[in-house]
Amino acid sequence: MAIMQINFYSKMLKKNTTILAILPVDKPDKKFQKDVDSENLKTLYLLHGYAGNYMDWLCGARIVELSMRYNVAVFLPSGENSFYLDDEEKEEYFGEFVGNEIIEFTRSVFPIPQKREKTFIGGLSMGGYGALRNGLKYNKNFVGIIALSSALIIHKIAGIPKDYRNAYASYNYYRRVFGDLNSLIGSDKDINALVTKLKQEKGSIPKIYMACGRDDFLVQENRDLFNFLKNEGIDVVYEEDEGGHDWDFWNKYIANAFEWMSKVSD
């Protein structure tokens, strides 16, 4: 097992950024052989939630254990509070960063598979939304999406007034992150619209694993998305259980997600 912190210059963010790499190499009973074993790996780009950073998954979940057990290389980037969307004013393109640039960078540096059918994106809360949005927008890069307790908030913030404020942020934040809030529905930030567009274009739609706790304040939005995806004929698994918006729930269901991931093929 190798855990590495990598600092590199991102062209999409126009600054140095840090990612954490967890690689299941050199197991106690078997030495890693790049030419043979790299193609047996799967790769997961795993996104943190609001107010988090690249350390969240390492500190909060059993990611190292799961990486070893399921033979998955895991990469943990920092998305700040961007919802993993592009900010054209600041020229920080977090969507392009997690949807494309980080895949190209890690494939050029690490002994990981180069193929879509081995590549997944996932996340929790804000990161669950980011995984869904960018997994669909950059669908040619990902065979599967893991979305836990996803922050599917666009229908709540679409068209909000300028004096709007909730427990998390204000109109100014949502306007900065999501752009014109009156044009949000139907845009490429709308998960439903992305699915509809891919179906119309006959694009390859990644398989999706979703989970949310019954006591989570986002549970109805996650139910609604699951029902939409199911009605659209998308290959989606949804699990709901007792629990809230916390690491107790995410620890249980990221393990289920790894099990699901082990069975996914293109």
Curated annotation (Swiss-Prot):
It comes from the Bacteria. GO terms for biological process: xylan catabolic process. InterPro entries: AB_hydrolase_fold (IPR029058), Esterase-like (IPR000801), Mycobacterial_A85_antigen (IPR050583). The keyword Disulfide bond does not apply. Coiled coil: none annotated. Its EC number is 3.1.-.-. PANTHER family: DIACYLGLYCEROL ACYLTRANSFERASE_MYCOLYLTRANSFERASE AG85A, ENTEROCHELIN ESTERASE-RELATED. This is Acetyl esterase. It comes from Caldicellulosiruptor saccharolyticus. The gene is xynC.
